[in-house]
Amino acid sequence: MKNQTNTNKYNLTNDVIKKEVDDILKGKYQQCVLGTLNQNGYPYLSKTLPLYYEKKIYLLLSDLSDHTENLKINKKVSIYFAQEEIHKERLNNPRLTLLGLIKKLKLNKNDELFRKLLKNYILFD
């Protein structure tokens, strides 16, 4: 009997996984949540719309937002992406969580990077 290749998600090649992650970062998701820690160490989560450009994730955060206040204390963030729920068992639906440190950039509407970010921003269905 020949060896049969199992094509489930657990046996994907690194190239396939990299492509799926890249697709998610480029906008193939339904929801995205940013997580920061408040001054008491509690997680604070809210929906966000990241901008993905040149292999970097950019977030537009108001100086008045709770996340901005939290990031003054702790630069650690988590970003959670959820794709369309296609499986009956909800825990089996595609998702991606990224952890990292955030860096603040001061941009205004006339900055070239800001214009490029908006130009490359993908709107979803």
What are these regions (language model features)?
Residues 1-125:
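Binding-site signature for planar aromatic cofactors or substrates
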